C-alpha cells in the first residue's frame, strides 16, 4: 500500500520571478494520488537514468528533504525544512523553463503547468516523485488577478521523475531514476534533474531483441517453427527501422493482428508475459532503435537438404519470396523468388 509522507504543489508562471507554493486542500489529494500513480505505475513510456553527481540542486534537495522526513519518523510535524527544499526544487525548474522559453520563443512555447512533489513509502521502499502537470490559467473578471485551475478529467502529466531512495543511518542515497518526458525536451533530464541515461539506444535494442527472442523461443518455437520465424522476422524488421520505439506498441504491433497457424499457441499469454518485462529495469520502455544491432542478428540459416543450405536475411514479407509446397508424391519443395540472372541461369533448363 502506498503512503504519501510529504507532498507539495507549486504553480509555475514564467512571467514572474518565483513559483507560487499552494496549500493542498484535502479534496485535492485525489489529484495528487493520480499524478503519483501515473508517474510510478501507469506510465509505460520512460527511460532509466542515474545520478552522476549527488550534490546538484535537485538531487541534494531530494536527499535532504527525504532524510528530514525519515528522521521525523515518517510523519512531517515540522514542515520547515521540507518546504524550503521543495521551494528550491520548484525555483530550479522555473528558472530553467524561463531560460528555455527565452531561447525557444521563436519556435515554440514551454508547456504551462505546475510542479507536484511527493515522498512516498511503498512496500518498505522510499521514492521521491516530481511531476510537471497541466494547469490552465485565467484572469478574475473583477480583480484581474491570475488564477490557476486543473482539469477535472484527462489530467495530463507533461513530465515526471521517480527517484528510488534508500535510507540508512539517517542518510538517504539515490538509486535509479525513471524519467518520462512527453515532448522529448532535453532540459528536463539534462538541465533540471542533471542526470544521465543508464542505457544507450544500442543496449536497449540488444536487451529488447534478446528478451522478446527468448520468449518466442520458449513459447512459440517448440510448437510452430512457421509462427516462430514469422514473429522473429517481424521483430527484426521493426527494430531495424531507424525510429523511436515504444515497447508496449512494439509488442502490440507484433500480436494485435497476427493469427498463429498453430491454434495451441496462446498469443495473449505470450503478449502478457512480454509486457510484464516493461516493469523491469533491463531496458527503457522508449528508445531509438539501433539498426546495427539487428543487422548482426538478422540472418537465419535453414538446412534444406544434405547439399543445400538457405541463408535468409531479415525481410518484411518473407512469404512473398519463399513458398513451401508439398507435391502429391509427398515431396517437400521450396519455391524461392530469384531476381539474380546468373543464379537463375545456373539452374534453369528449358523444357
Map each language-model feature to its residues.
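C-terminal structured domains
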Residues: 253-351
Amino acid at each position: 500500500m502506498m503512503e504519501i509522507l510529504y507532498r507539495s504543489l507549486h504553480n509555475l508562471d514564467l512571467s514572474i520571478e518565483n513559483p507560487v507554493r499552494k496549500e493542498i486542500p484535502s479534496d485535492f489529494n485525489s489529484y495528487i494520488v493520480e499524478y503519483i500513480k501515473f508517474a510510478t505505475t501507469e506510465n509505460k513510456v520512460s527511460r532509466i537514468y542515474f545520478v552522476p553527481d549527488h550534490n546538484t540542486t535537485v538531487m541534494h534537495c531530494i536527499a535532504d528533504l527525504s532524510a528530514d522526513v525519515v528522521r521525523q519518523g515518517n510523519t512531517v510535524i515540522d514542515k520547515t525544512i521540507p518546504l524550503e527544499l521543495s521551494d528550491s526544487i520548484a525555483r530550479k525548474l522555473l528558472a530553467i523553463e524561463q531560460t528555455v522559453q527565452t531561447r525557444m520563443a521563436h519556435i515554440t512555447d514551454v508547456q504551462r503547468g505546475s510542479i507536484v512533489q511527493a515522498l512516498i513509502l511503498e512496500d518498505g521502499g522510499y521514492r521521491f516523485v516530481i511531476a510537471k502537470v497541466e494547469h490552465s490559467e485565467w484572469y478574475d473578471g473583477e480583480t484581474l488577478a491570475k488564477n490557476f485551475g486543473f482539469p477535472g478529467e484527462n489530467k495530463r502529466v507533461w513530465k515526471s521523475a521517480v527517484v528510488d531512495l534508500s535510507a540508512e543511518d539517517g542518510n538517504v542515497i539515490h538509486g535509479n531514476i525513471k524519467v518520462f518526458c512527453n515532448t522529448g525536451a532535453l532540459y528536463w533530464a539534462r538541465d533540471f534533474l542533471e542526470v544521465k541515461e543508464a542505457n544507450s539506444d544500442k543496449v536497449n535494442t540488444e536487451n529488447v531483441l534478446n528478451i522478446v527472442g527468448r520468449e518466442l523461443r520458449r513459447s512459440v518455437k517448440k510448437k510452430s517453427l512457421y509462427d516462430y520465424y514469422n514473429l522473429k522476422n517481424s521483430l527484426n524488421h521493426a527494430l531495424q527501422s531507424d525510429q523511436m520505439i515504444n515497447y508496449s506498441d512494439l509488442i502490440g504491433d507484433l500480436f494485435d493482428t497476427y493469427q498463429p497457424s498453430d491454434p495451441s499457441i496462446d498469443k495473449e499469454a505470450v503478449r502478457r508475459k512480454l509486457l510484464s518485462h516493461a516493469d523491469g529495469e533491463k531496458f527503457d520502455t522508449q528508445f531509438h532503435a539501433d539498426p546495427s544491432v539487428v543487422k548482426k542478428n538478422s540472418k537465419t540459416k535453414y538446412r534444406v537438404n544434405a547439399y543445400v543450405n538457405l541463408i535468409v536475411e531479415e525481410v518484411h514479407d518473407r512469404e512473398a519470396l519463399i513458398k513451401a509446397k508439398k507435391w502429391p508424391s509427398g515431396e517437400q519443395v521450396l519455391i524461392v523468388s530469384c531476381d539474380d540472372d546468373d543464379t537463375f541461369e545456373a539452374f534453369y533448363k528449358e523444357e
